[in-house]
Structures are given as structure tokens and as C-alpha cells.
Amino acid sequence: MHLLRTLLLRSNTSNISLLTKCAFRACPLQKWPVSLRSGCQVSVLPTQQKKWLHSQPKQQDSSTKTPVHDLPSGSQHQSEESSPSAKSSISTDTSIVAETDPLQDQSIGLLKRFKKTFKQHGKVLIPVHLVTSSFWFGSFYYAAMKGVNVVPFLEFIGLPDVIVNILKNSQGGNALTAYAMYKIATPARYTVTLGGTSLSVKYLRKYGYLSTPPLVKDYFQDRMEETKELFTEKMEETRDIISGKMEETKDRISEKLQETKDRVAFRKKKNEEM
């Protein structure tokens, strides 16, 4: 039995060696994954001695950028925490815009600046506008008297034929021509009015005829101080009222206690006498 076992083992080993030789001749280099967790690979080389070569796992390329949604939450919080500075800068920018005078603000249109100046400096703008408008209309009327014809200019601009025909066939004469020129020069008139208003306001403020408006920041600060004072006064009043009520209730309770003490003492005396 022992001899049979040894023969069988030798035959099996010879078959295995033949199979391995054939496999090495068919493919000289083969790779088998050994561990899935580590990602290593084993390479078998057909040499006289069997050599097992471990290849390192592929490292991730550092040049590849991680998308924004794969970033950790801490980096996102840091990016969000940088937003208050932007908010504060926006708030300061808005306060600066609010503090600018419409006469000096060149970021808005001419008509809007004219309306804002009318709301803020209406008492100065109206006389200046009347004076400049009378000057404009007078100069245009004088030009119409001297024979200035506006119709070719209106046709060149491209105004509707209805307006051009009214000026051609009108009996108004110089007045209508002057009015047409007056309306055409509206942007120039508004610009001159704003310039005159600015100079007038500076002159009146310089000599004390017009008070300089406070800044928006100072105005809000004054209002906050006023509301704070009113709030403290109301709190003191309510505190005094509550303290007075507490004193009244304390006096009443002390009176009731004294009455009950007197009654108890009187009853004790009665019981002792009896």
C-alpha cells in the first residue's frame, strides 16, 4: 500500500510540472490579483527559480481635480464664512451711494438725477429752472426772428411728418419755432439747470442760508440714540410702576398678617380669661 501511494504522488507531481511548463511556454507573463483590498498584483516570470513580483497599486494622479460637491464640509464652510466680508463691503457701498448728493452722482441718468435733485433741493431748483428756461426760450425766439428755420433740422433728425407739417403750415410763426427748438434742447436745458442748482446750493451753504444735510449714517445714529433714550425712559417708568405695585401689595400683606396676629392674640386672651 505504501508503494502504491508513493507512485501515485510521483505521477501527480510529474503531471503538475508538465502543465506548468506548458502554461509558461504559452504565455510568458501572467498576472493574478492577490488581494482586492490593497490592489496589488502578482507577476509570475518563467525563470529557473520561481519569482513572485508584487506591483504597487496605482496612485491617484495629483493633477486630477476633485469636483466642488466632493469637497469636505469644512472647506465648504470656510468658503461660506468668507461671505460676511463681501456682505459688509456691499453694505458699506450701499451706504456710500445713499450718502452721495444727486448733484454730484454721475452714475444715474440725467432725468433721474433731475427728479432726485427736485425732491432734495426743490426750493433752489425751481427758481434756477425758471430763469434758465426763460433764457433758453428768449434766445430761441430771437433766433427765430432772425430767420432760423428748424424744419430741415427736424427732417434730418427723423421726426414724424405730422410734427414737421405742423411747423411748416403753422400760423404761429416765431413762437412755435422757438418752442420746437426749446423742446429739442431739453437735455442741454436740464444739464444747465443742474449745474446752476449745484452752484446755488454751494453758495447758499457757504454763507449759511441753506443748512447742510446730515449724512445718512449720522442721521440713523441719532435716531438710534433717540429710540434708545425713549426705551430707557419707558423701562424706568415701568420699573417704578412695578416697584410701586410691589410696595402696595407688600403693605397689604403685612396689614393682613398683623390683623390675623391681633385676632389670634385676642382669641388667646379670651380663652385664658375663660
Curated annotation (Swiss-Prot):
Q: Which UniProt keywords apply?
A: Coiled coil, Cytoplasm, Membrane, Mitochondrion, Transmembrane, Transmembrane helix
Q: Which gene encodes it?
A: fam210a
Where does the sequence pass through the membrane? 124-144
* Location of the region described as Disordered in the Swiss-Prot/TrEMBL record: 51-91
The job of this chain, per UniProt, is described as:
May play a role in the structure and strength of both muscle and bone.
Entry protein name: Protein FAM210A
InterPro entries from the xrefs? Answer: FAM210A/B-like, FAM210A/B-like_dom
Signal sequence: where?
A: none
Q: What topology in the membrane does the UniProt record assign?
A: Single-pass membrane protein
What is the scientific name of the source organism?
Xenopus tropicalis (Western clawed frog)
Q: Which sequence ranges form a coiled-coil region, renumbered to this chain?
A: 221-274
Give the main localization category: membrane
Low complexity composition-biased segments? 81-91
Q: Which family does it belong to?
A: Belongs to the FAM210 family.
For this record, an example GO cellular component is: membrane
Domain (DUF1279): give its ranges: 105-217
Q: Where in the cell is it found?
A: Membrane; Mitochondrion; Cytoplasm
Give start-end positions of Polar residues composition bias.
51-66
